[in-house]
Design a protein with these regions (language model features):
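Glycan-recognition patch characteristic of GH18 chitinases/ENGases
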Residues: 26-131
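Enriched for extracellular/lumenal, surface-exposed ectodomains of secreted and cell-surface proteins
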Residues: 454-476, 547-563
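Short flexible loop/turn segments that cap and initiate beta-strands
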Residues: 411-436, 508-523
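Conserved, mostly hydrophobic/aromatic
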Residues: 59, 143, 171, 214, ...
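Beta-strand-rich domain onsets/edges
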Residues: 380-413, 479-501, 506-507
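Glycine-centered loop-to-beta-strand initiation motif
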Residues: 436-450, 529-538, 545
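Glycan-binding loop/region signatures in secreted carbohydrate-active enzymes
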Residues: 257-346, 378-381
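Substrate-binding surface in catalytic domains of secreted glycosidases
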Residues: 69-83, 149-294
Length: 572
């Protein structure tokens, strides 16, 4: 019994622990851009994402709605789009983007609140969401449950709050156990001293330790009457309160890419085709990229309001009966919308408060100048890059054996990076996601070393912890092969012409390892290990003397090839 002898091979891999911007390799921007990708207009919206990969860590396809404790509506499927959803997912994942699809509350008033109050229903919702994430191998989920504040009413919040917190705790555990992320999107909340009407039901302080992202919807300030969509002082107050409730790195500021066009006055009698739509208080949406054309086509001159950090203009529009030119009315309209300066003012809060980033509603609404403004700020707050080397004394080990891994981390100017938290991660054939096997901290020379034991063939990498000052770093992946151990329950001697059952054990204990047993150097049969790594075969010697047995293991995705020592027994 035994395994084949191995050569010790030393390798060194040099890698850059940050994704470099193709435009400027010396100053890659901080990845601060995230946001929502609606199911519609993918032909326009996807290029915004794919053209700015150096700014983006994750996005949220806005595709799902919770309709019951066991049911989720697939908005993409209902749209009957020609491109299969799986193709869109694969396309985004191929670009290295984390996918945290958004699920909204599509129930009627108080339905979700009542479901969360029932422990069984609450658990069912958790499992329903978890199943969705695992089905498509998403990187997590983003909750956008707005019914609490748009329909349920504040009088329901006191009873709802503990159930909401319990739900987030249970969902967090279920997702984190699978290596998945939990993002929660909420309207703003505010410190009591601001005297602003907040949304305390979302319990930022209580859910902060449980979630990975908080996205603040800093928009819809003005809805029924003309005004800024998300005035900057109001927005900043929400940010300032959020970072007192949880780490700033978890906070993402939601930024609108849209504005509104309100009717403030109507003169004359509107033709019948317009009597219901052209009324005081009616409003239409206008997206950033289209607002300048709307102003120009109506001879309006937008002005930028520096206090609110948004643009505004007014104009008049006449609505004429197509069959009677004498029948018309004229509406006075007021427009508020964000532009590139609005994006810049809000993105500057990322650096000011060291936030996780911004989240745009939605990708594709912005103009080119807005993305340029985000990029310029992202470059100005770019974190340091870290360069590392990874070396191992073995590329192939026997089962149960140790190999040594050493990493060295330096800045581009060769300065060592001490006290850097580094994780050693592995991924084998049974893993859907990378998992941490060991962790440590670099010494004064920027060096970290791990003695490692692997049970089966695995990919390995080092990942340095990200911080405001430095990016998270991921090395290239390296494969360490594991040579299985084999044991046989052969007796020291057997009787001639007598059948014996021999049991074998392969370590690691995994199913599906294929092997050949040889008797006197000739194949006795082909076998496959069961779930415990075991196998069995029959022997029967025809003559007295000595008999030899040997096991030859074929290479597979879980193991490398191996040959045991020959075992000799007496046949009497």
């Amino acid at each position: 019994m035994g395994s084949r002898k191995l050569l010790i091979i030393t390798t060194a891999l040099t890698f850059l622990l940050s994704t470099l911007s193709p435009a400027n390799a010396n100053n890659p921007p901080r990845k601060i851009l995230s946001g929502w990708l609606p199911d519609y207009s993918l032909a326009r919206n996807l290029p915004t994402v794919e053209g700015n990969l150096d700014l983006i860590r994750d996005i949220s396809p806005f595709w799902y709605g919770l309709t019951g404790e066991n049911s989720i509506k697939d908005k993409y499927a209902l749209g009957k789009y020609t491109t299969p959803k799986e193709q869109v997912i694969a396309r985004l994942k191929a670009n290295g983007i984390l996918l945290l699809p958004t699920i909204t509350d599509d129930n009627n008033k108080l339905v979700l609140a009542n479901l969360l109050a029932n422990p069984t229903s609450r658990s069912n919702i958790v499992q329903t969401i978890k199943a969705l994430v695992l089905k498509y191998n998403y990187d997590g989920i983003d909750l956008d449950f707005e019914t609490f504040y748009t329909q349920d009413g504040r009088s329901s919040w006191a009873a709802l709050k503990p159930n909401w917190i319990a739900f987030i705790k249970e969902l967090s555990t279920a997702l984190h156990d699978q290596g998945k992320l939990l993002s929660v999107t909420t309207p703003p909340d505010f410190a009591p001293e601001t005297k602003r009407a907040g949304n305390w039901i979302y319990s930022w302080a209580e859910i902060g330790p449980l979630i990975d992202r908080l996205r603040i919807m800093a928009y819809d300030f003005s809805t029924t009457s003309p005004g800024p969509i998300g005035p900057l002082p109001w927005t900043e107050d929400g940010v300032k309160y959020a970072i007192t409730q949880m780490p700033a790195s978890k906070v993402f500021l939601g930024i609108p890419g849209y504005g509104r066009d309100w009717i403030t006055k109507v003169e004359g009698v509107c033709p019948k085709d317009f009597t219901s739509s052209v009324v005081v208080g009616a409003k239409a949406a206008v997206v950033m990229r289209e607002a300048p054309n709307l102003a120009a086509s109506n001879n309006a001159l937008p002005t930028y309001n520096t206090t609110n950090a948004e643009s505004t203009f007014t104009y008049k529009k006449t609505y004429v009966d197509p069959t009677n030119s004498a029948s018309f009315c004229t509406a006075s309209r007021t427009v508020w919308y964000p532009d590139e300066r609005s994006y810049a003012a809000r993105t500057n809060l990322v650096g000011k408060y060291r936030l996780g980033g911004i989240a745009v509603w939605t990708f594709g609404m912005e103009n080119t100048a807005a993305i340029t403004a985000v990029r310029d700020i992202a470059k100005s707050i770019a974190p340091d890059q870290v360069i590392g080397t990874l070396s191992t004394d073995l590329e192939e080990i026997g089962y149960g054996s140790t190999f040594n891994l050493t990493g060295t981390f330096k800045l581009p100017d060769k300065t060592p990076v001490p006290a850097l938290n580094v994780r050693f991660e592995i991924k084998n054939s049974s893993d859907n996601n990378w998992r941490t096997l060991s962790a440590g901290v670099t010494d004064l020379a920027g060096v970290i070393a791990f003695p490692i034991i692997l049970g089966q063939k695995s990919q390995i990498r080092l990942v340095s912890e990200g911080s405001w000052e430095r990016t998270e770093g991921k090395t290239i992946e390296k494969v360490i092969s594991v040579v299985p151990n084999v044991s046989l329950s052969l007796p020291a001697s057997i009787k001639v012409a007598t059948s014996y059952t021999v049991y074998g054990q392969v370590l690691p204990k995994v199913a599906g390892i294929k092997l050949v047993v040889k008797q006197n150097k000739k194949p006795l049969g082909e076998f496959t290990t069961d779930a415990s790594g075991g196998f069995s075969f029959e022997i029967k010697a025809a003559t007295t003397g000595l008999a030899t047995y040997q096991v030859v293991i074929s290479a597979g995705e879980k193991n490398t090839a191996a040959i045991s020592d020959e075992i000799t027994i007496l046949v009497r």
